[in-house]
Structure formats: structure tokens, C-alpha cells
Amino acid sequence: MRGPVHLQIEHQPVLDAALRAELIGIWVDATNAGGALGLVAPTNRQAAEALAAPTWTRVEAGHDDLVLGRRDGRVVGWCVLESRGNPLSPHWRSLKRLQVHPDVQGQGLGRALLAGAEDVARRLGLTAVHLTVRGGTGTESFYTGLGYREVGRLPGALRLADGDDRDEIHMWRDLGAG
């Protein structure tokens, strides 16, 4: 049996150029290792930076919350709690881009990062978290095992390539459920 996973969770760290570069590096490496994170492998820094730019702007403006995990001082994973910007849904956010660097995957760090993000969400007064996963990856079983439930599916909503359309699976977790 594996011992406890030690991951230092940081909420809203200063998003300077060095940290941005680190986060983009993790994103590119995780995508190229098979991660379903909004890009299609093979990808590069330029593609990730273009997709990340609006996120960085929203984090810096205080609309969204960056959560990252450090192990022995090194950033090994990150995610964003994205605000809906809707006055009818201030009680929940969407969890976006949960990722752990491929060279430390399989050590429980993804679970630890998710638990840390959920703790941040609770401290923000949120009562639920929503996320989406790409169909055909098996990722939904990871989240189901951690208390998330499928609440909807958009058939063929994600086009990875001609002839390769995947479902976008929506999942939900009531944060009061433990």
C-alpha cells in the first residue's frame, strides 16, 4: 500500500513569466504524453500559450482561480477553477485543465491536486464543481472513483481530427458530499 502523498497546494500564486513558462511546459508535456487537455498531440508551446492567454488574463483579473501543486519545490501539476460569470451560478465553478507532469504520474499526485482544488473551492464558498472530460480516454472513471457523477454528454462535440469525433462528458461533484 502506498503511503501518504505530499503535495503543497498553492492558490492564486503570482503568475509571472517564469511560472507561466513552467505551466505551459507541463501542459505541452502532458498533452504529448496522451493527456486530454484541450489540445491534440503532437502540440507545442505556441499552441498552448495561445490557448492559455485568456485563462491567464482571467486569473490575473481575479475572475478565475489558479491552483497548483508543488512537490519538493517543483511545480508538478495545476488546474483552474473557472467562474461562470453568471449571477445565477456563483455557488459552483468549472474545474479546467487538471494535469500532472507525465514524469510524476501514477504517484497519486492527480488525486492530491484534485483534493487540493476542491479544498480551495470550499474555502471560496462553492458548493459544487463541474468538469468535462474527453470521451474515449477512460478519464471519467478516475473522476467517478473520486465522487464525480456524469450529468450529461455532448455526442461528437470534440473533433480531434477528420473522422475522430469524441463525446464531451460533463461531470459534477457536490462538495458537501465529502
Question: Where on the chain are the PLM-derived regions?
Answer:
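Active-site acidic-Proline motif in GNAT/NAT acetyltransferases
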Residues: H101-D103, Q107, G135
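Helix-turn-helix
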Residues: T139
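Acetyl-CoA-dependent GNAT
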Residues: L7-R97, H101, L114-G116, V120, ...
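Conserved GNAT acetyl-CoA-binding A-motif
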Residues: L114, A121-R134
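Conserved catalytic-core motifs of GNAT/GCN5-like acyltransferases
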Residues: H130-R134, T144, R149-D167
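Actinobacteria-biased recognition of intrinsically disordered, low-complexity terminal regions
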Residues: M1-V5
